[in-house]
From Swiss-Prot:
Lineage of the species this protein comes from: Eukaryota, Metazoa, Chordata, Craniata, Vertebrata
Metal-binding as UniProt keyword: yes
Family annotation (PANTHER family): MITOCHONDRIAL INNER MEMBRANE PROTEASE, MITOCHONDRIAL INNER MEMBRANE PROTEASE ATP23 HOMOLOG
Positions that bind a divalent metal cation: H125, H129
The protein, known as: Mitochondrial inner membrane protease ATP23 homolog
Species this protein is from: Mus musculus (Mouse)
Length: 201
């Protein structure tokens, strides 16, 4: 989501990086877990409040895609600060993350992010939107092509639509993976546009 709905977009404060999220909290949806989630010994030692920030820090420190995106954003004049631009929160539904334009923060849904690999995909997905906004000054509410392009890039480049993830979502078809992947990367674009009321789903 970019700017305030119904009003003009406000620029960032002096020296504050441009970070906006196009899809009004619908980013990085994951299928709901079936039954009660199994907790391992180590994960049972941490409460949700502790595990989300720890997984985020590990992702920022070790995930090569995240490190590449953070470096690219820094070189584009949009440096990201962990304390300022990331927030672990409890979210409704099965949304895993999104961007809150009113606070310029990537919101990580601590109740829906299941493990370290999932955290890496969500952070990567959201940073792709932030990078698109930084480098291209995307108009999220006025140009649905910008929104769709960013969603397709994020779904494709973040690993959301990998063969393994699609198999876990019970979308089978080894020979037809390219067709399944095409459907996967277009799904978030359609969801974001329908949430904004720009197209009917």
């Amino acid at each position: 989501m970019a700017g305030a709905p119904g009003g003009g977009e406000l620029g960032p404060a002096a020296g504050e990086p441009l970070l906006q999220r196009p899809d009004s909290g619908q980013g990085s949806p994951e299928p709901p877990a079936h039954g009660k989630p199994q907790q391992g010994f180590l994960s049972s030692l941490f409460t949700r409040d502790q595990s989300c920030p720890l997984m985020l820090q590990k992702t920022l420190d070790t995930n090569p895609y995240v490190k590449l995106l953070l470096d690219a954003m820094k070189h584009s004049g949009c440096a990201v600060n962990r304390g300022r631009h990331f927030s672990c929160e409890v979210c409704d539904g099965n949304v895993s993350g999104g961007f809150d334009a009113s606070t310029s923060q990537i919101v990580l849904c601590e109740n829906n992010i299941r493990n370290q690999a999932h955290m890496g995909r969500v952070v990567t997905h959201e940073l792709i939107h932030a990078f698109d906004h930084c480098r291209a000054h995307v108009h999220w509410f006025t140009n649905i092509r910008h929104l769709a392009c960013s969603e397709i890039r994020a779904a494709s480049l973040s690993g959301d639509c990998s063969l393994v993830n699609e198999l876990f979502r019970l979308r089978f078809g080894l020979k037809q993976h390219h067709q399944i992947e095409t459907s996967c990367v277009s799904r978030p674009a359609m969801n974001s546009q329908s949430c904004l009321g720009l197209v009917s789903a």
